[in-house]
Structure formats: C-alpha cells, structure tokens
Amino acid sequence: MTTVGTALRPNATRVMLLGSGELGKEVALECQRLGVEVIAVDRYADAPAMQVAHRSHVIDMLDGAALAALIADEKPDFVVPEIEAIATDMLVELEKQGQHVVPTARAAKLTMDREGIRRLAAEELWVPTSDYRFADGYDAFQAAAEAIGFPCIVKPVMSSSGKGQSFIREASQLMAAWEYAQQGGRAGAGRVIVEGVVKFDFEITLLTISAVDGIHFCAPIGHRQEDGDYRESWQPQHMSELALQRARQVAEKVVTALGGHGLFGVELFVCGDEVVFSEVSPRPHDTGMVTLISQDVSEFALHVRAFLGLPVGAIRQYGPAASAVILPELDSDNVQYANLSAAVGAGLQLRLFGKPHIQGKRRLGVALATGLDIDEAVQRAVSAANGVKVSG
C-alpha cells in the first residue's frame, strides 16, 4: 500500500528532480498536489521547477561526486531524472545501495546516449529500427556514411533538441556535418550515430506508462519537427488499427526491458501499417505537453502517479487537441509577455515557463487548444502562440 507523508515534516515523502525545466516544473506541480516534498536541481538558478519547489540546488549534474553528496544530504525517497545530462553511472551505484531512481538507473543510463538505447532495441529486443552505424573519428564517420548510403542523418550520441544533427545529401557535406556534430554533444566532441533515412508517413510519440496495475497507453501524439525540435503536437494522431497495435507492441517491449514504474515517451515512425522505433525517453516528453488539455490526467500526473506506486486505471482523451510552442529570439534576463488575452479562452490555454534567461532562440511557453478536428486545434494553438508578444 502506498503512503505519502506531509511535506516539510519528518515523515515527508521527498522527490528530487534532476533537471528543472518546463517538464520538471509540471512534475513538481503534480507532486505538490499530492503533498509530496519537492527538491529541484539544475545547473542554473531560478529554473522553472525551482520556482514551485520546496527547495532547490544548483550543481553540475554530470559531476558524480557532487550529485552523490547532494543525494546523501537531502535523502530523497525518489530521484527523478528529467534530463539526460546526468552522471548516470553514479545513479547506478546509488541504486545498488538502495536509492530509488525513477524509473530505474539502468533506464536513465541507457537512454542518456543514443547508442545504449539503439543497441538494446535493435540487437537485444529485435524491434524494427533504421539502419545505423556508430563512429568515433572522421574516417570512421565517412566510412559509416558510405556504408549507410545517401541521404543519411548524423547525430551526436549525446545530444538533445536537434543539437549537432545534420541531414546529409551527398559526400561533399560530410566534413561540415562532422564538425557540427562535434559542437552539439552534451559532453563535447565525441561519438556519433549515422542513420539511414526512414520513409514514413508521420512520426508519433506513444506515451506509455508502467504502473502497479500494468502497462497503459495514451492516444498517439503526432508532431511537427523543425531544426530537430518540436513546434506543434496534436492528439489523437490518426493511424490504422494494425499500426497502432504494432506501435503498442514495440513500446511495451522497450518499456518492459527498461524496467521500473513511470511514464515513457516512445518515438516511432509510421508508414502505412508498419512502425519503426526511433527513440525513447524514460520521463515525460515535450510533445506530450498537449496532454495538459487533451486528457483528464496529463502525462506529468501519470508519471507521478506511476512512480509513487499508485494505479493508473483508465485514461480519458477528450478529443482533438494541439500544442504550439512559443519560441522567440532575443537576448534578455528580464523577459516580458504581452497580448496574452488572445491566447486564453474557451478551449484555449497558455503555459509560460518562467525561464529566467534567453539568449537567441528558446522555448519559453506553449499554447494549448482544442478543436472540432485536429486541423482546427493546431490552427488555434499556432495562432495563440504566435500572438504572444515577447520582449525584454
């Protein structure tokens, strides 16, 4: 039986968030709703989740010793990674000593880089993936690209939000793509993955929850990517029953192999009735922000419910809904938002993340909308997001 203590009391149930961005902020809010004490951690001060947590700390989360010292000091019941750039080897060691890592330290380690999860999916679980090769140096990268064939895609094995990623059409682009990949990795220059291009009709995120009452699925989420990062997402994404069945089979196989309880964002390519595995995040997914308006229980609430050991039960999806990001470009430590009235109303909601700094382009919020169909929902969300005026 799950029990929850009282925040800021000796019997408190404590959750430590490793990563305090917009996704972590929503997880923190859901923890707060259940009376859970929240400790938010990130590499910079005043991150979004820190603004709604009981306490916060600024550390280099890739520093294993610093991370272990903080966990020893705070003694959280649950360590909840919300980003990939964490000293996962230390999490594995702490888990062996009895620390609860969500969903598991192994899941955090395998999904920190593309190589771990790709080898698990393709070579151990035998789920369909794109053709791929890994390379450490330019010569090996060139050979990998030639073996895969053109066009192909190169990505650092450790990167996110499209950083360091290139679409290569011909051999003359290899050097530029290699240099860009070396700049985009979370840990600096290093290993890359070269992938063959998959012919697909659309991409989906299948939010998959592993809980005490089994495996659960949200309705599939479609999304549009630009520069390697999502711009709009919508739910439900229409697909054939056979494709949906296959997507669920792949997602369940991957999630079960990673283990633990929590929500996983499983990314898949869909072409007709066929599905191809792309990536998985063992945590809420940015495209899943649409669930803040599209479901009775958001992806963030589902994640918290699952890792606390509570049953998920049925998930109600309300109908066509969409999200669109607010992505301004400016330099400021004092951001201001205007024209907000156009972004709220019946079936129209706004989330501003409260990020304290922007330098260049940065996702600062999201507009959420419902509609009579997906096209209308997306149009309403995009219009609302574009209407928000950001200055600083």
UniProtKB/Swiss-Prot annotation:
**InterPro entries this protein is in?**
ATP-grasp, ATP-grasp_carboxylate-amine, ATP_grasp_subdomain_1, PreATP-grasp_dom_sf, PurT, PurT/PurK_preATP-grasp, PurT_C, Rudment_hybrid_motif
Q: What is catalyzed by this enzyme? A: N(1)-(5-phospho-beta-D-ribosyl)glycinamide + formate + ATP = N(2)-formyl-N(1)-(5-phospho-beta-D-ribosyl)glycinamide + ADP + phosphate + H(+)
Kindly list the residue ranges recorded as spanning the membrane: none
Name its pathway.
Purine metabolism; IMP biosynthesis via de novo pathway; N(2)-formyl-N(1)-(5-phospho-D-ribosyl)glycinamide from N(1)-(5-phospho-D-ribosyl)glycinamide (formate route): step 1/1
User: Which terms does the UniProt entry file under GO BP?
Assistant: 'de novo' IMP biosynthetic process
PANTHER family in the record:
FORMATE-DEPENDENT PHOSPHORIBOSYLGLYCINAMIDE FORMYLTRANSFERASE
**Family of this protein:** Belongs to the PurK/PurT family.
- Write down what this protein is called: Formate-dependent phosphoribosylglycinamide formyltransferase
